[in-house]
């Protein structure tokens, strides 16, 4: 983009209104609350990932056990032909 497409440059330092002490304290309070919220969300996300991992491992373990315990070869070894009835 060229300079004409970007728009005019704004100099904030010269024309920006000065913030009073109450506004600065309010900004710090909001920033602290936001940091607390971010930490809480990170903790919740970590716990959700751990729970999802545990559930995934459990599902794979149950699936693996069921495949191992009911193998096709063992299942067909016990199969007997039905006896034919002679009339």
From Swiss-Prot:
Which effects follow disruption of this gene? Answer: Deficient flies show developmental delay, lethality, and a dramatic decrease in the levels/activity of COX.
Instruction: Give GO terms for biological process.
Output: mitochondrial cytochrome c oxidase assembly; positive regulation of mitochondrial translation; respiratory chain complex IV assembly
Give its localization: Mitochondrion membrane
According to the record, the segments passing through the membrane are 47-69
Q: How does it sit in the membrane?
A: Single-pass membrane protein
| Record keywords | Membrane, Mitochondrion, Transit peptide, Transmembrane, Transmembrane helix
Q: What does this protein do?
A: Plays a critical role in the biogenesis and activity of cytochrome c oxidase (COX) (complex IV).
Q: Which family does it belong to?
A: Belongs to the COA3 family.
From the Swiss-Prot or TrEMBL record, give the protein name.
Cytochrome c oxidase assembly factor 3, mitochondrial
This protein's encoding gene: Ccdc56
